[in-house]
Structures are given as C-alpha cells and as structure tokens.
C-alpha cells in the first residue's frame, strides 16, 4: 500500500520570483504527496544549506537544478521500494546519503521537499489528514490545538525596501475565541492600518510577507500606527490584540565594532543598551514576544536579555537556534531565550523538525511554527502547527496568497476538528 514507486523533483517559482524545489512521492497504491521547500531572506549562519546553482545566466544564479537532480537521481534511487509510513527511516536515508552536517551535497531544499511530500503521501495512504499523521509521527496521536497567529502587518529589515530597521511588527488576536475569529480581527486591523498610513501620507505598498512597508520616523512609530489601527478597528490594545516583534538583529549588527547600528533612526547600541531599548518599548506597548532581539552570536547578550526580560516576555530564538537540536540544547543549558522559532528548511527534514519541537516543549520552551519570506502555495506549516499542538504560528499578513494559503488551511482544519482542537490564545505565549 505505502511502498514508494516514484520520486520526482522539479524547479518551480516562489513568492519572490526565485526558483525553489518541489517534490512528488508516488506510492504503489496510487497515492501521491507533493510539497515545496520555502526560502529565507534573513538567514542564520548555521542553517542547513539551501543549494543554488550559481549559474548567473539562469535566474541570476539562484536556479535549483542541482537540487532537483539530487531528487531525481540519488534520492529517488535510495527511496524506491521503501515504506513511506516510516518517516524517520526515509529522512535518515537521505541524511546519510548526503553525508554532510548541513545537507550541503543535496541541499536542504531537496531533502525537505521530499521529506514533506513523503509525509503527505503516507497520510493519504492512511486515509487521514496530514495534521493527524503528523500528530502520530510526533508521538501525540489525537492531540491537537489551533495556533495563535502572529500576523506581520508592518515589514522592515530584509523583508522590505524601507528605512525601518526592525524586520517584523506583528499583532496577535488574543481576544478571539477561535482561530477563525482571530483571523477576522487581524484582517480588520490590517485594513484599518491601511487607512491610518494613508491619512499620514505613508505608502501602503507591501513587503515580502504581505505587511505594509512604509518609511517611518522610527521603529516606535510602527507600534504607534498599529495601536491607532487597533483602536480604529474597535479593539482594545493589550486585551483583544497584543504585539510582537522580530528584530532580526543580526541584520543590523556591526560585527567588527560589536554594536547594533539602527541606520533608520541614526542610533547605535551595545548589547546591554539594546536590551534596555527593547525593555522600554515593552513598557510603552503591550509587546508579549520578541524574536532574535540580538545577533545570533551574541550569547552573552542573550543571557542578559533573558535575565532582564525572560520572566515577562517570550524571547524567541530564530537565527539563534536555527531549528537545530544541538544548538537548542546549548541554549537550554545556558538559560538563553525561552522559545524557539521552527522553520523546517533551517534543518531540512520533518523528523528533525519534530525533534526540535519536542526538545523545546520538554524544556519548558515554547515553539512557534514559521513560514519563510520566500513561500509557495504549500500550506504544510498549518498542519504542522495543529498536529504538534505547538500553539503559535507566524505566517505573514492578511495579503498575498502565499501567506493566506496557510490561514485558509487553518480555517479548514478548525472546521474539521471543532472542539478537538482548542484555541488557547495568550495562554500559549511564554511569560503570559
């Protein structure tokens, strides 16, 4: 029934107009799973390798024909005849065949696309939704929850062509009783934010993740205009809607000088000064979560940040941990951050992703399931969030089909599961 008979890779286009890898896994029973790898813009230096061709004559060097060739060649040969239900075995075969610590031979984009396609094929063979199959792979069959969305409604940093240093300003619809109601709140705030920005003469063009990307006077002004939009939508900031930020601070860290250079504001900070800057913002606004608040290598600074803010705020490690259990284990041991961002292309397989989520939860850290800035219509992260009962998801704003595809899948899942998948809102956020 679930024996693999064919593995196929192809080059498709992502939401930024760059190529990415799509894979199909065909089973003897006729079931097929298909999945595509996402791609990041602000990336951690210790992420698994995304293999690009480097041929400047094609897609400005960003082609993925080498990764596709790995799928259609050695990966396909190794997996044909194997049982798709044995996800850990499938993933380990590809990891061993690649033979590197960071999947540099085949590319994490090749291995991940096949890994996810395999999971989809196996779920189909078992006549169950992907989220239910993921729950079984996770060792938590039948345990589900609907995630609280972190909705990125103002884009800056590497995700936008503007002067805003902090990469993401997000809202969380914590006053909602259901995921679907939360999305309605998010949409209403998003539309009111457009009106607020227009009234101030700001652009309402959007960035990579569907949030607005205006040139603002300061990072604090981003929070101020969001606060205005929340009120204009008829909601109470701090009660119905809370705030979150992804600083992506590695992108404005001057390694040689050892300072954080926020060019948009013309300010520089030491690690300790930047931690106090974030603390001041959190005092002024109901910010409940801060991601990558320092450079990925600034572990001493992160330790100070955790001591300063960790009992009050969720401190999420993205570039810091890169969905890697070895690095996460070090962070847990040293008491650095209290949450991990989960991006399965940072590590390159579903099995390793599930291991990172489990390690985080076992240590009392939260796990936030995340998209990348380069996405496709693939909505697997919605099923991952529900099937692991992770509790939180980051998948962009209320525009761009590559973002909304994930929200729409969550709506379908909530409809199917009903009370079996509670929406716990702010209770899911560390420190709240």
UniProtKB/Swiss-Prot annotation:
UniProt-listed Gene3D superfamilies: Enolase-like C-terminal domain, Enolase-like, N-terminal domain
Listed EC numbers: 4.2.1.11
Gene Ontology biological process terms in this record: glycolytic process
Cofactor binding comment, as recorded: Binds a second Mg(2+) ion via substrate during catalysis.
Positions of (2R)-2-phosphoglycerate binding: 167, 343, 372-373, 394
Cofactors demanded by this protein: Mg(2+)
Enzyme class: lyase
Assembly and oligomerization: Component of the RNA degradosome, a multiprotein complex involved in RNA processing and mRNA degradation.
Keywords: Cytoplasm, Glycolysis, Lyase, Magnesium, Metal-binding, Secreted
GO MF annotation, one: magnesium ion binding
Protein name from the UniProt record: Enolase
Residues annotated for Mg(2+) binding in this entry: 246, 291, 318
Protein family membership: Belongs to the enolase family.
Function: Catalyzes the reversible conversion of 2-phosphoglycerate (2-PG) into phosphoenolpyruvate (PEP). It is essential for the degradation of carbohydrates via glycolysis.
Species of the source: Aliivibrio fischeri (strain MJ11) (Vibrio fischeri)
Entry keyword Transferase: no
NCBIfam families registered for this protein in UniProt: eno
Catalytic activity of the protein: (2R)-2-phosphoglycerate = phosphoenolpyruvate + H2O
Record's subcellular location: Cytoplasm; Secreted; Cell surface
GO cellular component: a single term: phosphopyruvate hydratase complex
Pathway(s) this gene product operates in, as recorded in its UniProt entry: Carbohydrate degradation; glycolysis; pyruvate from D-glyceraldehyde 3-phosphate: step 4/5
Active site: 209, 343
């Amino acid at each position: 029934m679930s024996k693999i008979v064919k593995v196929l890779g192809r080059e498709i286009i992502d939401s930024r107009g760059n190529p990415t890898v799509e894979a199909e896994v065909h089973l003897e029973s006729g079931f097929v799973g298909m999945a595509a790898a996402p791609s990041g813009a602000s990336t951690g230096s210790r992420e698994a390798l995304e293999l690009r061709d480097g041929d400047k004559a094609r897609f400005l060097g960003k082609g993925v024909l080498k990764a596709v060739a790995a799928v259609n060649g050695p990966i396909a040969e190794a997996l044909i005849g194997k049982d798709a239900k044995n996800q850990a075995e499938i993933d380990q075969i590809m990891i061993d065949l690649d033979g590197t610590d960071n999947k540099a031979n085949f590319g994490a984009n090749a291995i991940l696309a096949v890994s996810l396609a395999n999971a989809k094929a196996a779920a189909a063979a078992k006549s169950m939704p992907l989220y239910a199959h993921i729950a079984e792979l996770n060792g938590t069959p039948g345990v589900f929850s609907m995630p609280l969305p972190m909705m990125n409604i103002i884009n800056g940093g590497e995700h936008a062509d503007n002067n805003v240093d902090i990469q993401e300003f997000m809202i969380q619809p914590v006053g909602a009783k259901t995921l679907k109601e939360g999305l309605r709140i998010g949409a209403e705030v998003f539309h009111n934010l457009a009106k607020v920005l227009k009234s101030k003469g700001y652009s309402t063009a959007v960035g990579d993740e569907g949030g607005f990307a205006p040139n603002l006077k300061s990072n604090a002004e981003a929070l101020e205009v969001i606060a205005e939009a929340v009120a204009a939508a008829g909601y109470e900031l701090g009660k119905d809607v809370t705030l979150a930020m992804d600083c992506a601070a590695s992108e404005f860290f001057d390694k040689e000088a050892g300072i954080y250079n926020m060019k948009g504001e013309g300010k520089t900070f030491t690690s300790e000064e930047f931690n106090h800057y974030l603390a001041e913002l959190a005092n002024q606004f109901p910010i409940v979560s801060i991601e990558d608040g320092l450079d990925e290598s600034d572990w001493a600074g992160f330790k100070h940040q955790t001591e300063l803010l960790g009992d009050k705020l969720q401190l999420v490690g993205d570039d810091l941990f890169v969905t890697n259990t070895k690095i996460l284990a070090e962070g847990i041991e040293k008491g650095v951050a209290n949450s991990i961002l989960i991006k399965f292309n940072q590590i390159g397989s579903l099995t390793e992703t599930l291991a990172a989520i489990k390690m985080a939860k076992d240590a009392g850290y939260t796990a936030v399931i995340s998209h990348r800035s380069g996405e496709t219509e693939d909505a697997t992260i919605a099923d991952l969030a529900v099937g692991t009962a992770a509790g939180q998801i980051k998948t962009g704003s209320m525009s761009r089909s590559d973002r909304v595809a994930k929200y729409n899948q969550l709506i379908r899942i909530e409809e199917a599961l009903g009370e079996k998948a509670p929406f716990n809102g702010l209770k899911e956020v560390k420190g709240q």
